């Protein structure tokens, strides 16, 4: 469950390293986001020579979540960190590589480009 002011790691090579959630998209009063949801983030740490600068605002898709998420078959999935992939306004990833595993829920939510770039889908 990601809410505004949550700090997240960035799982791609866009240049940002750490971001902070500033808004959960999908409703006027939505409080929490889960796997595969789109949020608006502010970049808190970035590499010095990247296109993404510290303080810039971007959209991101949640790919890993520390909170246990129940799947339709009754199993639960949980990761060691909260991580996002930065996307543009067309919801395509900004980076060209994705680091670490991503959840299978992204395929169900039509983020096939992120799933195809990921080294492992759990």
UniProtKB/Swiss-Prot annotation:
Taxonomically, the superkingdom here is Bacteria
What's a GO cellular component annotated to this UniProt protein?
A: cytosolic large ribosomal subunit
Q: What are the entry keywords? A: Ribonucleoprotein, Ribosomal protein, RNA-binding, rRNA-binding
Alphabetical list of Pfam families matching this protein: Ribosomal_L14 (PF00238)
GO biological process terms held by the UniProt record: translation
Recorded GO molecular functions are: large ribosomal subunit rRNA binding; structural constituent of ribosome
Q: How does it assemble?
A: Part of the 50S ribosomal subunit. Forms a cluster with proteins L3 and L19. In the 70S ribosome, L14 and L19 interact and together make contacts with the 16S rRNA in bridges B5 and B8.
Family statement drawn from the similarity comment of this UniProt entry:
Belongs to the universal ribosomal protein uL14 family.
Summarizing the function annotation, the protein's role is:
Binds to 23S rRNA. Forms part of two intersubunit bridges in the 70S ribosome.
| Protein name according to UniProt | Large ribosomal subunit protein uL14
Question: Which species does this protein come from?
Answer: Thermodesulfovibrio yellowstonii (strain ATCC 51303 / DSM 11347 / YP87)
Lineage here is: Bacteria, Pseudomonadati, Nitrospirota, Thermodesulfovibrionia, Thermodesulfovibrionales
């Amino acid at each position: 469950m990601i809410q505004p002011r949550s700090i997240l790691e960035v799982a791609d090579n866009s240049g940002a390293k750490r971001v902070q959630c500033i808004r959960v998209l999908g409703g006027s009063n939505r409080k929490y986001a889960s796997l595969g949801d789109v949020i608006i983030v502010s970049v808190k740490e970035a590499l010095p020579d990247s296109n993404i600068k510290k303080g810039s605002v971007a959209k991101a898709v949640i790919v890993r979540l520390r909170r246990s998420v129940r799947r339709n078959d009754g199993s639960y999935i949980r990761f060691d960190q909260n991580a996002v992939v930065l996307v543009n306004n067309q919801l395509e990833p900004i980076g060209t590589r994705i680091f670490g595993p991503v959840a299978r829920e992204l395929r169900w939510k039509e983020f096939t480009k992120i799933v195809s770039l990921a080294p492992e889908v759990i």
